A protein has these predicted regions:
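Membrane-active amphipathic alpha-helices
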Residues: 1-36
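Membrane-inserting hydrophobic helices used for pore formation or membrane fusion
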Residues: 11-25, 85-89, 100, 184, ...
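Charge-dense, extended regions
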Residues: 186-248
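Generic L/I/V-rich hydrophobic alpha-helical segments across diverse proteins
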Residues: 14, 21, 48, 59-66, ...
Length: 248
């Protein structure tokens, strides 16, 4: 059973960080208009990615990301012109877990596109583990099969980011991971209001996290989850899957 009790000081620091992030989101939501119509990017896959990273590490995030996209595309019976956006690696630090996430996700989908849907989880996990060896940014190159199965069976593309995050939090009793998931969810909700080319928002988020007095390990987990979530937002061509109605 996971235990990683947070100190009163760290709980307070996390509460303040969330409050600061909500304030930043509110400013972007206020300015997010095109004429009189509000627009939002559909970034639900980032929730699966963040959950994979926080609960299992970088290799699990890549596996979860690839499976969530593949399964959702099949369920909606939509053929996309491209699985990926043109900006999949734009404005991402080449040494970051986010960059590694996008580059490796694209490689796996392109090389195994025809077999991914029916591929056993063990086989995908082995592919990701082998390919991860080339990426120093992926510190945990092992794929926990049980965590991956939980994420994919729980992921709901028709639910909100927050609903998915709340469901993923049930996988762990570790408050550090639960808090990191909460913060990744807040950031994904904020990213809905900015364009793919916008780097100002994520820069603001990272400055707030860096300045926060939360503990080193918690901060590292949060920053990795944010990097993967931001990368996911730039990766999957999710607008082509929005043809079917989704829950608000």
């Amino acid at each position: 059973m996971e235990t990683n009790k947070l100190s009163t000081k760290e709980v307070q620091a996390l509460t303040e960080l969330k409050s600061d992030l909500y304030a930043v989101n509110a400013e972007y939501a206020k300015s997010n208009t095109r004429g009189l119509k509000k627009w939002l990017r559909w970034l639900i896959f980032g929730a699966a990615d963040a959950a994979g990273f926080v609960t299992g590490g970088g290799a699990v995030a890549i596996s979860a990301s690839t499976l969530a996209w593949t399964v959702t595309k099949a369920e909606r019976e939509i053929s996309t012109n491209s699985d990926f956006k043109d900006c999949a690696e734009v404005a991402l630090d080449k040494g970051s877990i986010g960059y590694a996430h996008n580059e490796l996700s694209q490689k796996i989908v392109r090389e195994h596109q025809d077999s991914l849907l029916g591929m056993p989880i063990d086989q995908l996990a082995e592919i990701v583990e082998e390919e991860s060896k080339a990426y120093p940014a992926i510190e945990n190159k092992s794929v926990d099969r049980e965590i991956l199965k939980q994420i994919i069976s729980t992921f709901n593309a028709d639910a909100s980011i927050q609903d998915n995050i709340n469901a993923f939090k049930q996988f762990t009793n570790d408050p550090q991971k639960q808090e990191a998931l909460d913060i990744c969810g807040i950031v994904l909700e904020g990213l809905q209001n900015v364009s793919d080319e916008n780097t100002t928002y994520i820069d603001q988020v990272n400055r707030l996290v860096d300045a926060s007095p939360v503990g080193f390990q918690t901060k590292k987990m949060i920053k990795g989850g944010i990097s993967v979530a931001d990368a996911s937002a730039k990766l999957w061509n999710s607008s082509e899957l929005e043809e079917l109605p989704k829950a608000k």
